[in-house]
Amino acid sequence: MIVLNGYDILAQIYESVNSEVYRAIRTVDNQPVMLKILKQEYPTAQQLTHYKQEYKTICGLNFEEAIKAYGLETYRRTPVIILEDFGGISLKKWLEGKPLPLREFLSLAPRIVANLEKIHNAKVIHKDINPANIVLNPETGQIKIIDFGIASVLRRENPGLKNPNVLEGTLAYISPEQTGRMNRSLDYRTDFYSLGVSFYELLTGQLPFPANDALELVHCHLAKQPLEINSLVKEKIPPVVEAIIRKLMAKTPEERYQSAYGIRADLEECLRQLETTGKIEDFVIARQDLANQFQIPQKLYGREAEIATLLTAFQRVATVDKNSSHTELMLVTGYSGMGKTTLVREIYQPITEKRGFFISGKFDQFQRDIPYAAVISALTHLVKQLLGESQPQLQLWRQKLLKSLGANARVIIDVIPQLELIIGPQPEVLQLGAIATQNRFNLVFKNFIRVFCSPEHPLVIFLDDLQWADLASLQLIELIMLDGDMDYLFLIGSYRSNEINSTHPLTATLDKLEQGGIIINQVILKPLGPAQVNQLIADTLNHSPEYVQSLSALVWQKTHGNPFFVNEFLKTIYWENWLFFQSGQETTTKTDNNRGYWQWHLGQIQRIGSTDNLIQFMMGKMQKLPPETQEVLSLAACLGAEFNLYNLTVISEKSPSELLPILTSSSEAGLIILLSELDEQLLIQEYKFAHDRIQQGAYALIEDSQKAVIHLKIGRLLWQHTSVNELSEKIFKIVDHLNLGYQLISEKKERESVANLNLLAAQKAKAANAQAGALKYIKTAQKLLKKSSWKNNYQLTLNIYSEATEIAYLSGNFEPMQRWANLVLKQAKTTLDKIKVYEALRYPLC
């Protein structure tokens, strides 16, 4: 029992893995209260964040049925939330696993829905609806929903792909999309699924999916249907009541109810029939269900054959069969906006069934010289998934990794620093010659990948936007795919077919793979047809395809069926109020729903000019944003497809509190996506642009004459805010920005410092066997040197040209190698200074 000054503790009434709840009396006014406190003596930063967010969220719920928060106290090292005590008991404890009689259920359920409706109207998504968080006062009948620890105040979230052991929410109740394995963002309808599971449990006394294993339970939410309610209870449950619960528990949000009003209307109709006639007849459910929020369905239209091709290929890879290969390469191609990335993520569900790993990385259009950028990003996500495993499982992975990597584990840690969290600090590797270092890197990297490829855990690697891949990454793909010992690996690459020609490095890589006997499968995505656009718009507006025919024909004509363009076009006409929700009773002739329907101004929409240029279209949209938002998004675009709040505060010279409203509104508008959870300051730190074309549109807002100036400023600020210990990890991003504006650097000392940074970047790229990137960095280092540098900064100049000689050799550029070697031999002051060049010149050329 805790002791908290100012409160008389009466009893503990609830205990979970993380928290305890006590009944108490506040001594100053004898007010009954509840105290919610974390159990851990030393709470994690994430737990503290959830508590602060819960208190803040509850304080923002200004309606009678909301639980009230009276204050936030501190007990030792943990916060204590002071909540009202209205004499309630959780439905979980009240029922004690017994089924609730139908009449009592129908008396409670509409009030629970009404409470949830008010929470949603306050723009809060609860994300943890379950009977333990629904509290009833049996005497007064008052119902309140509690526990807002993971609630979201955002209209939409993008849950990442996580280990099931670390998912937010109560696993038995979370929606398929909340698992992060459904290829879609999360909105208020996640609570409807959890509500459906809760209603199922209230009526049956059982959970719909009584699995114990976390991954198995996730798979049940994704793919399995629960037993019929009437097969589990003695009391006959009317089919329409079960139909309501089934609709709530639909696997995709589009198939569920779209409004709490619609759920409540159907439940109240059931209760009305039961009270007036003693029975419940069937009726068409969801007739009063209509969302007045504008939401474009996230499901794919017209891609059934392509999805089947992808899933069949994965099944081949994951099936244990000694007579067939278990490594495949699949290329997904098409113009920008065709939905290549979205299509690939449809593979989440079967991967979960096979207990496989899915990792992805994306090449950045503005940072093409960073070696292995997408590969490292993908493998870093894999390491993070492993860190969510239980300690015994993590120990098994540690043993596998150390056995496979041996004395060379440091090679991988230098590329993926987070791996050290699993295998611990590792000694530096032996220094070898350049060719031997290359060979070691290739061998160790292949061994590292093989650890995760097994029949128990097939591995899917998705590399997005291969048209922007660096040469080192393409060579690594070639290395992995031609490895005869690699099994249970499914490598998927996507690229824009209109940006690849016969001279592109990707073409050469694919030619080599075909010559090596690798079968390259391909999915080509084409624009949507008029019928598919018609169905998408009909689903969006909850109308029949016939009713929206005139609008959909115009949208198809304007967008040529490009899925991204269709979505953005619909958002544009909605923002312009040319597509709007008309409420009122007079609409009953249009639909069965008397709450309203969607209308549009066809003439206004017709005036929008047609364009095939998506960048121009997005740029036009962004120019309508407030100037401050345009500035922030254009700076974010300079940082990359993904960016973080810290770097944005540095380069914009704005505080987090100034940036937060801008980023939140941009997220609400679908321009950027949130990648991380709230931190201890209740800030989101990680973001990404929702699409490449949005990033390009934001970048295009910057005048061409100012781009070099801005990149130079970004490079300087990032460099200034990077410690010596962090420099190696951030070197490529810093140098890439500086190099875009290096010609504007006039001061000799700064030019030499930036030249030295390029030297460090070249050395790191060379060590990672990324010789093409290393050559670019070393050439820029040379350009930054003054003609008198051999005289005025001898050591730096010697280091740059000696390194250049070796890199030129390793990359097969023998003409500049000889030229730079001769220069070093001419300018070097001692024999010792010439050794590195002599070694390069003596290397065998075969």
Kindly give the residue locations of the regions a language model identified:
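Short secondary-structure boundary elements
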Residues: 287-295, 331-338, 343-349, 377, ...
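C-terminal lobe helix-coil module of Hanks-type protein kinase domains
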Residues: 172-276
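Conserved Walker-type P-loop NTP-binding/catalytic site
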Residues: 373-460, 508-514, 518, 528-538, ...
